[in-house]
Amino acid sequence: MPHSFGAYLILYIMVDLFNYTRRASSVAHIGAIDLGGDNPIRIQSMTTTNTNDTEACVRQAEEIIKAGGELVRFTTQGSREAENMKNINAGIRADGYQTPLVADVHFNPNVADVAALYCEKVRVNPGNYVDPARKFIKQEYTDEEYAHELQKIEDRFVPFLNICKEHHTAIRIGVNHGSLSDRIRNRYGDTPEGIVESCLEFLRICKKENFHDVVISIKSSNTVVMVRSMRLLVEEMEKEGMNYPLHLGVTEAGEGEDGRIKSAVGIGALLADGIGDTVRVSLSEEPAAEIPVARHLVDYIGKKKGHLMIPATACPSFDWLRPTRRETVAVGNIGGSNVPVVISNRINGESTACENKDATPDYIYIGGKMPKQFVLGQNYIVDYNVYETLNSKPETTGAKLYPIFPAMAMPLIASIKADVKFLTLQYGTPAEEYIACLKAHPEVVVICVSNHQNRLGDQRALVHEMMNAGLKNPVVFAEMYQHGKEEKSDFQLEAAADMGALMIDGLTDGIWLMNNGDIPAQTIDETAFGILQAARLRTSKTEYISCPGCGRTLYDLRETIAKIKEATKHLKGLKIGIMGCIVNGPGEMADADYGYVGAGPNRVSLYRKQVCVEKNIPQEVAVEHLLALIDSDKQ
């Protein structure tokens, strides 16, 4: 009988919502390193070179290693590539590196058998290890038929495990949302439950066979699906007496700022809850460029260790595994069913006009200082003690001003008339006082701030305290950073990581990013909107779901991404998948409007949703064909 998730219980077996501790996992021995347990969170990447080209693979692997990579993965799509891992391994060892090498296998279990002879770890994909490649067809299985399919997996997987035991080879059970088998999809749907069950089917065999050098990954280009699936996996493993180490990554994250922000939202949300033993940031860039991004994320979250305890009580109705948006009453355009708002600072009297209309903040905070010019129709937040004075000035005609109060000014809220009022609160403010205030003033939006070492736990604590009191005032999370403009990437990673769990938990009615440094205000605004889009909460631009490339990619991926972006960047709200090959292509493009997928050497197939509409187009004209397809659908 297949495993059933049955009735869901709200359990907190693995996670303290308010206090950071790293999840206790077993240890996987992978060549010269150990992964999991008390070992450092390992950083890794994957080559993009042809695995039959030994020299190129050795060179690129060593670039990754020199950048700080602790594991290096190679695509092994056939037995020839798997056999050549022997030469690649020898070349890297001859240069004095003992870094473990990982073979990435899809579709062919025989290739995994060969790779296990020459690599320290082999990744297999449950979606295509024994199950045939998905065709997105509907097929009902009886329990007996389903059990027969599971037996087929065990009959093929156990001999592979025996090879791994003999050669001291570790494995990764790597589930990709985009390559779930039709069997799983038909039984569980395209859901986190299906993703987790796909993984557990293989883990149960490992446990039964007493094979413990196992690492697990669950990846998706959808950050919400990725985080919820990994949370559910942790919970289900605990129920079944498993605690294997976890590999984190957002697949097909893209490149540049968008790729970094999307990766940080997903990976950061899990790391902040103590989940994760190794990280790969999948960027459509040079593999070595992934390493410092992953390292900064891991180090940033690691600063939470040893923080002062946050004594808080979780709201009983909150479901960490399947969170829904916290119920709030709309105050103006904040909360209720409104998309989360963006608040931004302009406190030095500078212009409040915004060049990027798609990243214009919903509210601009100006403190107590008049800007050079008020923008017609723009919402402004001003300090409560100058609100009435500024609101009466003729210069503000056509603009909308709203007061903000610090916690100590709560008694004055009733004396000032405004449709929307803002109140800054931090966990630890006397609860009786602020709860009474918020109950009396439903027009107040809470600005949740924190200077705690673990600001995620601190900010969660305030909102859970509000939920326990039955308050329905909207909450905007405000975060302060200190970075110069040369540290823009660090700012974006930290902000996305801090906001990730809060957004996926359904607690966010708005975000307010601040920086004590010279990062331009427009960059901060664009980052805020990018974070909301990465968390699937608000769309402000074209979205690109692009893979990082690997040895299977047979066209110039980065050049193609640049061409497609340049030609489609004005198509706000459109999702375009750009995939090197068909391994995850159609699946990871599940909610993409269009897809550009490698089909062979310099050949591309085009998709509308998950349906292939043009096959094997020459690469040199494929972008033009994609644009023509998009244009034809507009008509």
List the predicted regions and their residue ranges.
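Short, acidic/polar
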Residues: 52-63, 108-112, 263-267, 350-356, ...
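N-terminal amphipathic alpha-helix/helix-capping segment at the start of soluble metabolic enzymes
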Residues: 14-45, 161, 165, 303-350, ...
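Glycine-rich phosphate-binding active-site loops on the catalytic face of alpha/beta enzymes
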Residues: 70-71, 119-135, 273-287, 506-519, ...
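Extended, intrinsically disordered, low-complexity segments
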Residues: 296-345, 367, 378-412, 419-422, ...
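Active-site mouth loops of central-metabolism enzymes
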Residues: 40-56, 101-108, 184-196, 252-261, ...
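Conserved, mostly hydrophobic/aromatic
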Residues: 43, 104, 173, 216, ...
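Active-site beta->alpha loop and helix N-cap motifs at the rims of alpha/beta catalytic domains
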Residues: 16, 69-201, 344-355, 360-456
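Catalytic alpha/beta core domains of metabolic enzymes, predominantly
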Residues: 140-153, 184-334, 420, 429-571, ...
